[in-house]
């Protein structure tokens, strides 16, 4: 009996050691892949604990996915060592505030209202990437500048449609220079305010001439390096998914804002994203709608480009549920620049 007890204890200890070694191996690989460095051993222990907890949540969700209880899969990514509250405060920077009244010396013009094209049969699927109107996925880093990436993406698409040339535009130009228009750099902003700044400023510099830094810096716009201009902006009727669909089909990529405040979005990997807790009014993240379609399982979706690099989501993209009561607010604050 004593021998049996000793054997059980030995096996339990061996399994514990093996599990610990496995976690450490995965942790070390995670740090290497995502270039993680911590200020102290104490911080690393805390980050490891958060990482393990997030892995557990992801595994439980994916079990439900395998059972057909979820429509999308999650995956460990570079944000796996962050508390969800940290993550949201760091990267979600869409500020839906009516700051027009408090702006001094700057006039934010009223948007042009989108008029749906008459007698036009829109296709069942659209993907502006295939038409060459979308630049590669970018990475905003630890800066709440999502709004600037959404704005440049929409203008890049409109500029391409007008000129046939795809030019990557400078988010840093918007972060540094559009403050008096109501934007707050790494602390958030709005795409419409960015479009207004670009119009009044006479353009926005190219990404090459004004590279991204992921910090608030001094404005050094160069009029000789302008990559695109706009004449104002068009707002899609609030909450109208059908109007958003027609705009995507006939105009090009559209700036949208969504509720990305959920852990499920932090670790999204593939599939059609539907989060029951999503809000259609409390929006916190600016992204770019570049198309729409229907999955093999019959789920309608919006094809959305994010600005968290290619290691997040499906190579940097997410399929958001479509025709589900304006899910996550995809059509609540949709707009595009006039060129």
Curated annotation (Swiss-Prot):
<dbReference type="InterPro" id="IPR013128">
    <property type="entry name" value="Peptidase_C1A"/>
</dbReference>
<feature type="active site">
    <location>
        <position position="285"/>
    </location>
</feature>
<keyword id="KW-0378">Hydrolase</keyword>
<keyword id="KW-1015">Disulfide bond</keyword>
<keyword id="KW-0645">Protease</keyword>
<feature type="active site">
    <location>
        <position position="306"/>
    </location>
</feature>
<dbReference type="InterPro" id="IPR025660">
    <property type="entry name" value="Pept_his_AS"/>
</dbReference>
<keyword id="KW-0865">Zymogen</keyword>
<dbReference type="InterPro" id="IPR013201">
    <property type="entry name" value="Prot_inhib_I29"/>
</dbReference>
<feature type="propeptide" description="Activation peptide">
    <location>
        <begin position="17"/>
        <end position="121"/>
    </location>
</feature>
<feature type="disulfide bond">
    <location>
        <begin position="143"/>
        <end position="186"/>
    </location>
</feature>
<dbReference type="InterPro" id="IPR000668">
    <property type="entry name" value="Peptidase_C1A_C"/>
</dbReference>
<feature type="disulfide bond" description="Interchain (between heavy and light chains)">
    <location>
        <begin position="278"/>
        <end position="328"/>
    </location>
</feature>
<comment type="subunit">
    <text>Dimer of a heavy and a light chain linked by disulfide bonds. Interacts with cystatin; the interaction results in inhibition of cathepsin L-like peptidase activity.</text>
</comment>
<dbReference type="GO" id="GO:0006508">
    <property type="term" value="P:proteolysis"/>
</dbReference>
<dbReference type="Pfam" id="PF08246">
    <property type="entry name" value="Inhibitor_I29"/>
</dbReference>
<dbReference type="InterPro" id="IPR039417">
    <property type="entry name" value="Peptidase_C1A_papain-like"/>
</dbReference>
<feature type="glycosylation site" description="N-linked (GlcNAc...) asparagine">
    <location>
        <position position="95"/>
    </location>
</feature>
<protein>
    <recommendedName>
        <fullName>Cathepsin L-like peptidase</fullName>
        <ecNumber>3.4.22.15</ecNumber>
    </recommendedName>
</protein>
<keyword id="KW-0325">Glycoprotein</keyword>
<keyword id="KW-0732">Signal</keyword>
<dbReference type="InterPro" id="IPR038765">
    <property type="entry name" value="Papain-like_cys_pep_sf"/>
</dbReference>
<comment type="function">
    <text>Proteinase exhibiting preference for Leu, Val and Phe residues at the P2 position.</text>
</comment>
<comment type="similarity">
    <text>Belongs to the peptidase C1 family.</text>
</comment>
<feature type="active site">
    <location>
        <position position="146"/>
    </location>
</feature>
<dbReference type="InterPro" id="IPR025661">
    <property type="entry name" value="Pept_asp_AS"/>
</dbReference>
<dbReference type="InterPro" id="IPR000169">
    <property type="entry name" value="Pept_cys_AS"/>
</dbReference>
<feature type="disulfide bond">
    <location>
        <begin position="177"/>
        <end position="219"/>
    </location>
</feature>
<dbReference type="Pfam" id="PF00112">
    <property type="entry name" value="Peptidase_C1"/>
</dbReference>
<feature type="signal peptide">
    <location>
        <begin position="1"/>
        <end position="16"/>
    </location>
</feature>
<dbReference type="GO" id="GO:0008234">
    <property type="term" value="F:cysteine-type peptidase activity"/>
</dbReference>
<keyword id="KW-0788">Thiol protease</keyword>
């Amino acid at each position: 009996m004593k021998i049996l007890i000793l054997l059980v204890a030995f096996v339990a200890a061996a399994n514990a050691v093996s599990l610990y070694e496995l976690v450490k191996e995965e942790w070390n690989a995670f740090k290497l892949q995502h270039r993680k460095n911590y200020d102290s051993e104490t911080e690393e222990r805390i980050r490891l604990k958060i990482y393990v907890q997030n892995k557990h949540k992801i595994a439980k969700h994916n079990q439900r996915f395998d059972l057909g209880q979820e429509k999308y899969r999650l995956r460990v990514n570079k944000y796996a060592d962050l508390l969800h509250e940290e993550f949201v405060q760091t990267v979600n920077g869409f500020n839906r505030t009516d700051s027009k009244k408090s702006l001094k010396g700057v006039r934010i013009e009223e948007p042009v209202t989108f008029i749906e094209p008459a007698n036009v049969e829109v296709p069942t699927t659209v993907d502006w990437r295939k038409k060459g109107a979308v630049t590669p996925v970018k990475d905003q880093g630890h800066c709440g500048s999502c709004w600037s990436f959404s704005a440049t993406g929409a203008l890049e698409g409109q500029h391409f449609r007008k000129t046939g040339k795809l030019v990557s535009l400078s988010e840093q130009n918007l972060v540094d220079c559009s403050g008096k228009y109501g934007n707050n750099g790494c602390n958030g902003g709005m795409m419409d305010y960015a479009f207004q700044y670009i119009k009044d400023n006479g353009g926005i510099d190219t990404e090459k001439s004004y590279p991204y830094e992921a910090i608030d810096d001094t404005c050094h716009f160069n009029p000789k390096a302008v990559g695109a201009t706009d004449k104002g902006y068009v707002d899609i009727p609030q909450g109208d998914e059908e109007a958003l669909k027609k705009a995507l089909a006939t105009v090009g990529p559209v700036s949208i804002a969504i509720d990305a405040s959920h852990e499920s979005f932090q670790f999204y990997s593939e599939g059609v994203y539907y989060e029951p807790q999503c809000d259609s009014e409390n929006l916190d993240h600016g992204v770019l709608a570049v198309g729409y379609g229907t999955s093999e399982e019959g789920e309608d979706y919006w094809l959305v480009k994010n600005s968290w690099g290619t290691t997040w989501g499906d190579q940097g993209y997410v399929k958001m549920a479509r025709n589900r009561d304006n899910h996550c607010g995809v059509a609540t604050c949709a707009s595009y620049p006039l060129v």
